[in-house]
């Protein structure tokens, strides 16, 4: 956590934990337990309130409306610290138009596509990233599926999805030099009809040759 923000000598802090998805996610209880255990081990007494953004369901504009409501509730509770889980929660928090994340400490976790310039402008933010190594994933994919020679990258039009595609394309450059027999294409699920996407990926005559990568979870995968 941010040095000097919470300490064992101070008690009863109000902590807001914003998760990117829903409480039906299989890992959400582990995240909550991890935060509560960490606070307890640090000797910090805190009231932890959990909010869920449900980013898989809403458009970004709707996420911003929801996040502003979350911030207003947090402000009314006199929240001392915000903790976020995964990219969507932090990105929407800092782009929803509310000033709260710029006024109090924010701890991030599980950020795959960090915006370094934003972090530089927010000295009140700390935490850790978990950047995906797509070079390792591509190598493992072809080891498991040696007969599949076409890499398909699924994306949507969101900022985070675009950042994910950039990361995959960067890994693809070195991968393709090592494995020139492979091909690569990106499919944006918001630029093609659902039927055409399903047909081209799942029911096409050559579908058994595809390795599909989704650098960011998108509702299409549901």
Task: Report the location of each language-model feature.
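Short hydrophobic alpha-helices and adjacent helix-cap/hinge residues
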Residues: 4-222
């Amino acid at each position: 956590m941010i040095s000097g923000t919470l300490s064992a000598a101070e008690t009863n802090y109000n902590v807001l934990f914003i998760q990117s998805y829903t409480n039906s996610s299989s890992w959400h209880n582990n995240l909550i337990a991890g935060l509560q255990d960490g606070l307890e081990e640090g000797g910090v007494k805190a009231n932890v309130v959990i909010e869920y953004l449900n980013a898989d369901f809403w458009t970004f504009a709707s996420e911003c409306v929801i996040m502003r409501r979350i911030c207003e509730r947090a402000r009314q509770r006199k929240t001392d610290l915000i903790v976020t889980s995964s990219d969507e929660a932090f990105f929407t928090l800092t782009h929803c138009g509310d000033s709260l994340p710029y006024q109090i400490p924010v701890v991030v976790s599980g950020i795959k596509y960090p915006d370094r310039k934003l972090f530089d402008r927010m000295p009140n933010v700390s935490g850790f990233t978990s950047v995906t190594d797509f070079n390792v994933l591509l190598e493992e994919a072809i080891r498991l599926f040696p007969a599949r020679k076409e890499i398909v990258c699924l994306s949507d039009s969101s900022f985070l999805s675009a950042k994910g595609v950039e990361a995959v394309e960067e890994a693809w450059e070195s991968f393709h030099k090592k494995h020139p027999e492979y091909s690569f294409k990106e499919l944006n699920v918001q630029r093609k009809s659902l039927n055409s996407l399903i047909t081209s990926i799942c029911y096409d005559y050559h579908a058994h040759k595809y390795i599909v990568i989704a650098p960011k979870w998108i509702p299409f995968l549901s």
